[in-house]
Amino acid sequence: MSSTISLKPTHLILSSFSTGKVLQFRRSRFSHTPSSSSSRYRTLVAQLGFRPDSFDFIKDHAENLLYTIADAAVSSSETFESVAGTTTKTTQSNDWFSGIANYMETILKVLKDGLSTVHVPYSYGFAIILLTVLVKAATFPLTKKQVESAMAMKSLTPQIKAIQERYAGDQEKIQLETARLYKLAGINPLAGCLPTLATIPVWIGLYRALSNVADEGLLTEGFFWIPSLAGPTTVAARQNGSGISWLFPFIEGHPPLGWPDTLAYLVLPLLLVFSQYLSIQIMQSSQSNDPAMKSSQAVTKLLPLMIGYFALSVPSGLSLYWLTNNILSTAQQVWLQKYGGAKNPVEKFTNLVTKEDKTQQIEKSFSEPLVQKSVSELKIPREKGGEKVTPECPKPGERFRLLKEQEAKRRREKEERQKAEAALSNQNTDKAHEQDEKSDTAIVAEDDKKTELSAVDETSDGTVAVNGKPSIQKDETTNGTFGIGHDTEQQHSHETEKR
């Protein structure tokens, strides 16, 4: 690199056109100062989050946003200005992104030399892929932290919605209760933004490194079907407004590069569009219940086409980096969200009573005056004398403690009630057994009685017959002995008299 020369503003670099009309158009449409850029970004976020059907906004600002990202990433690389047919070469500025870009460029060259030493074909292409994998692995802990924070925030969405409905119109109260909820859950709402912000300098540095290598003419070798990783265009050509001049206009029915090379260069942007579309479909299916994801589906459908268009105006080495990064990012998100790679830090946080249905059930079952008072005061402020009177809130943690005590009391009452029901059931069972035993005894006695009655029949002359035959009657005689039946005794006396 030569000595450092301060760069002109980015909007002047973008406005190097041959005609004044186009120059004025580019300056007014794509210029961006720091103040206007931050305002544009805030507007873009608001549009993406709350108005997904804003097609006019996307049409007017999509290309502007893409050029802004590209210029921010390569503003310190070698750029060219076309002034009266001459080209002036500028160098990197001494911003802190340049240091990262220099390190990335050095690592890329070391990887390329190492692969060339072991005679690996397409060494620069594989060096780009390997460098992307290394950077992705280095930033993986931050990505995991960001996904876990997003999962935690998604888990608390019902509680936050209940707080917003309960204190509707009182933004200060909503913020206070939401902050208390975050504190009880032990999460930081900014934890999901910080990892993403931390990875931005790394990826911008990598982008600049690849741009510098392409501008230095080091990516002249091909990669499988790609004729050259430095083609079909350059960053400087895109900045001059001729990024897709290799496609149009046709010359005698043929593109400027000819059909074979043109089709070969088109394969990589098409793969990038397909991979981006597939990534969006996978992520939307994994977040199908996320309201924020549903509201941005209309915008994300256009994202693959915008990225594909942008890939047409940069060297193929950058497109190869985007494709590799997109595949790795999709694989990371799928593993973290679908296969348990990331753990929800608030998964066990189930003791918060902030959902509307649970709150209503608890409020209806409260019987203590103190709890009734605290709940009613927290729910809505009373009006007295035409003025809105907001009662004092209980001490921090007081309401939660009362709720826990009430819940424990109801649990004890439920257990006692279950024990009483079990004892009553056992008592009823014992009584039923006793009644069954009594009824069985009565039935047996009745059967015995019927048997005796059927076996014993009285005759008409006063004798007792057993089974229809005369039986011996047990009579006590005057001398205390037992005699024979009356008929037998008379027969014996007659026989004695005859003798």
UniProtKB/Swiss-Prot annotation:
Swiss-Prot/TrEMBL keywords: Chloroplast, Coiled coil, Membrane, Plastid, Thylakoid, Transit peptide, Transmembrane, Transmembrane helix
Membrane topology, as annotated: Multi-pass membrane protein
Coiled coil: 397-436
Transit peptide start-stop: 1-45
Swiss-Prot/TrEMBL GO biological process terms: chloroplast organization; protein localization to chloroplast
GO molecular function annotation: membrane insertase activity
Membrane-traversing stretches: 115-135, 184-204, 263-283, 302-322
Protein name in UniProt: ALBINO3-like protein 1, chloroplastic
Organism of origin: Arabidopsis thaliana
